[in-house]
Amino acid sequence: DRVAPQDRSNGKMRVSGSPEMIETTEIVKKAAGQLEKSGCDVVEITAHDGISLIGHWCPCEEPKRTIVAMHGWRSSWSHDFGLIADFWRNNHCSVLYAEQRGQNNSGGNHMSLGLLERYDCLAWTNWINEKTGKSIPIYLAGVSMGATSVLMASELELPDNVFGIAADSAFTSLHAIWKHVSESNLHIPYACLLYTSDAADD
């Protein structure tokens, strides 16, 4: 859901005492702020199921390729891609940074761990082709749940100019990720969670 469980929210307040972790967090935060101030255009499309999707369009001069960047679960476009944004720009990449459904400024109250997000990814590739005239290659890139979203999008009928996918830290299955979330974030045994879910369906 859009609203995080209370335990998950409190967990964000806990940081390790590692100086390296604190330093890394500050570097990521600074890069995110720089990307947010880089002058990207805020754009909006309507998903296949009618919800509003927000993106940040960052065209470059003389682009050689376009990237659709999908961020992860309970994250943001600037947080997940702030550190790589300059690299992409310096290598002639225009980028569409998507805000995933059910998060931040996009519509919807739920995330589907890639099941619906794959269609959103397709919608963004179509938007780019309408914007640019299908003139240059498109690459799909994602982190965490965003990585799973772009991988699942590969089974759809993507435009011919989608040339590749970069998936960073995708999860292997819905069961695997729910086991991790239930045990690490919700502190509920996975078997108990499955039993509760089955009981609710009866």
Feature-to-residue mapping (PLM):
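An N-terminal hydrophobic leader/cap segment in hydrolases
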Residues: D1-E44
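Short coil/turn segments at beta-strand junctions that form active-site/ligand-binding loops
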Residues: K64, S135-P137
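Short, hydrophobic alpha-helix immediately C-terminal to the catalytic nucleophile
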Residues: G82, L122, L151-E155
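Alpha/beta-hydrolase active-site loop
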Residues: S112-T132
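Primarily recognizes the serine-hydrolase "nucleophile elbow" in alpha/beta-hydrolase
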Residues: P137-V181
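A catalytic-pocket lid/entrance helix-loop region that shapes and gates access to the active site
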Residues: K179-L194
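Conserved small/polar residues in nucleotide/adenosyl-binding loops
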Residues: Y195-D202
